[in-house]
């Protein structure tokens, strides 16, 4: 299982967010929960208060995926480190390649 999958008319992206980090970065590996579900590790320098870290995460995703923030929505995990983000654009090969490229190589 990957940290993303086609979902409805778009894509579901699973993220493990680490706020208050030294730098904004996408991780080189994934977090796997007890059920085997993968989450891409992402760190942001912003603190986790009043949704600031979530906003920073969406900005990072928008910039790297070249998608408007308005096309993304955190559908699960507003106040948790484990998040599910719905990307409301067609799941194409191009989008899949961009998502794969988020995971940095070690």
Predicted regions and their residues:
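Contiguous, often N-terminal, cationic amphipathic patches that form binding interfaces
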Residues: 1-50, 55, 74-79, 83-106
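Generic structural marker for isolated residues within well-ordered, non-membrane alpha-helices
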Residues: 58
């Amino acid at each position: 299982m990957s940290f993303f999958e086609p979902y409805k008319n778009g894509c579901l992206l699973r993220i493990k967010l680490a706020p208050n980090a030294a730098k904004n970065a996408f991780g080189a590996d994934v977090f796997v929960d007890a059920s085997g579900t993968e989450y891409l590790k992402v760190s942001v320098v912003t603190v986790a208060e009043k949704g600031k870290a979530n906003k920073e995460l969406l900005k990072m995703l928008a910039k790297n995926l070249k998608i408007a923030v308005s096309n993304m929505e955190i559908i699960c995990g507003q106040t948790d480190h484990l998040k599910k983000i719905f990307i409301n654009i067609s799941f194409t090969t191009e989008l899949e390649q961009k998502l794969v490229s988020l995971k940095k190589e070690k």
